[in-house]
């Protein structure tokens, strides 16, 4: 799979998710086999460039792979300037957000709200592509709602505007993340394009990934929520794609070490206060389905210091061998 001049020999990607796919999480997913990882969404509003949140999200040092940065907005010139600005900071690929369904994004006509205005889509894509000399990609959905599934039109506009690749989530905006992702329109759209396509949505196992790739003829898969609390999913996806079977499961000790390293990295990246707060959701995703996991999560959520959070989690993980011999993994059951 080629994105401009970049060759991706492993087109299994980590989707950009605001507040989740930060530098520590991208790094761990890459270590487990993600061949592409897009940074968290950055606003195109220049007045917000120097906020603490934006500065953290703009920290690409030591990324460990191609630096793909997602920008969001609805003003063509502002988006073009944001693209130039981020390339100046080290972005090697610019990704345009046309898939976010969040109200605060759609209320300013950005994210998936853009799909309602095809002429504006063309203006934005052309402005960004012409503003930078790096590849520009686009993440989008099936459409705004079921009666307005204009993905084929948006995809053709994208290709004609010079977009290097598409990532398509198999839901409309009004679906948010409810119901099941649908892939029929993605397959139809892919058949009329000459640029690479990632398929995204509800891909939570290697078996599902193989089936969706077969159905859509997509060039790669993009994993979002399926990786939450399971970054080792990328290891299994890659092995299954190459060999047609699952690799041996990670041991409890290997999973525990991964989790603790991740939490420590968040504490170091964000600092004491923000690190503890942001780590809570990841800890929940990791342990909720494990023995006594929910109870432990509630206990950890009451803690305010990084040391207490880490030590309590470590103590819990040390008890797991007494309660189970493996990490919960639904696609390995039976």
Spans of features found by a protein language model:
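N-terminal small/glycine-rich loop or linker at the start of catalytic domains
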Residues: 1-12, 45-68, 100, 104-108, ...
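Glycine-rich, positively charged N-terminal anion/phosphate-binding segment
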Residues: 1-2, 17-92
